[in-house]
Amino acid sequence: MIRQGRWLGIVSAVLLAVCLAFSKGGDAIPAVRAVGDLDGDGKPEEYSLAGHSLTVTEGGQVIWRSAGDWRVDSFALGDVNNDGTDDLALSLWKTGSFGTLRPFWQTGEDTSYKNHLFVFKLQEDTFKSVWCSSDLDCPIVSFAIRDVDGDGRSELVVEEGQYRRIAGERYALALDSPLRTAVWQWEEWGFRLRRLD
């Protein structure tokens, strides 16, 4: 009985640590790896997400790493903008939406820490931004790039949650929030909502 109680205590402590790490934005996610050839040069790139940082290598050389102030929680490879070549899509958390160039209605510094979706294209071993969202109304829980309706065009299928305020303008995913599925499709410059379940 003492051994069972001890193991139950250890398991409970581990589960508590994992839950706390997730709720505080910790690095509790396991490493995720993928292989793709986004630039079509016949040399596959390796994508590795570990410790909320995404690293891309080709032939053992690092060709790209996510910015140090981004907290990347997931990524997908696929033709999200339907131009015939695969893209890198990232769900990430960062401070601010606009950087140094701001729209006219944004008068002060944007210090909110929220979820964003960024899309990159790989050309000649250089990642170029295709689309970088402002902070999202609903944070991404998970997402995939696939043809949902059979029309031959990819959609971005997103499971969305809700934010919870941590402190000031810093937010995290509310783990107990209801989820909804949104289906988005690329149109010219950005995504248009096709369906919300």
Q: What residue ranges belong to the model's regions?
A:
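Beta-propeller-forming repeat regions
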Residues: 2-197
